Curated annotation (Swiss-Prot):
Modified residues (Phosphoserine): S218, S220, S223
Residues annotated as domain DEK-C: 1-56
GO CC terms: nucleolus; nucleus; RNA polymerase I upstream activating factor complex
Function field: Nonessential component of the UAF (upstream activation factor) complex which interacts with the upstream element of the RNA polymerase I promoter and forms a stable preinitiation complex. Together with SPT15/TBP UAF seems to stimulate basal transcription to a fully activated level. UAF30 seems to play a role in silencing transcription by RNA polymerase II.
Additional detail: Present with 639 molecules/cell in log phase SD medium.
Organism encoding this protein: Saccharomyces cerevisiae (strain ATCC 204508 / S288c)
Domain of life: Eukaryota
InterPro entries in UniProt: DEK_C, SWIB_domain, SWIB_MDM2_dom_sf, SWIB_MDM2_domain
Gene that this polypeptide is encoded by: UAF30
Regions of compositional bias (Basic and acidic residues) in chain numbering: 89-111
Cellular compartments annotated: Nucleus, Nucleolus
Protein name from the UniProt record: Upstream activation factor subunit UAF30
Keyword Phosphoprotein (UniProt): yes
Amino acid sequence: MAELNDYSTMIDILLSDMDLETVTTKKVRMALKEVYAIDVESQGKAINKLIRKHLDLVKERPRFERSLEDLLKENATLAIELTKEITVSKRSSGEEKNDSETKGTHVEKKKGTVSKSPISTRKVTLSKSLASLLGEHELTRTEVVRRLWAYIKAHNLQNPNNKKEILCDEKLELILGKSTNMFEMHKILASHMTEPKKISDCPPLIQEVRRKEKPIVSDSEQSDTKGI
């Protein structure tokens, strides 16, 4: 059971992005399978029990308080990132004003017309070493994990005697060190992913450059606009 408890942090992260009124243990289990790129069905009953335990804890308290309190115990760095994401998400979505709208959304989901992705689709900016390895500067956290596991499997970097241990090659060593395990890897990855900066967060010179990148309006278009 100690091995199963290593999934706790990721279960918390997944639940923080799910609709708690429609979430099922199967959704979380399938998300775990997708993130870790491993078969969790053989441990289905035990994992379901662990998921239900976390889900009960989540429903006892407000979502943002639960994620902060629990994740701080296991991964302070990741918890700080999640705090920033939660704050930005609440401000941009107007979470406090959408209670009535949420109920309507639940009705649509039961009809099968609307479904919420079980994993966050918010992209993050990758460090130079991680971007060089994965070939992208921005990806979702889930896609980072998926591509990294694809690389690990393609280059046979798992210890044959202990599949949880990863024996890094030269490229991967720049990111994870000489060796790591499948659970510690996700904590290390947190330091290689940051939220993309908005224009307002950039230095004045860069702000000016980005503003000048707006599409140029032709003279004819300008005259048409004035006529309107």
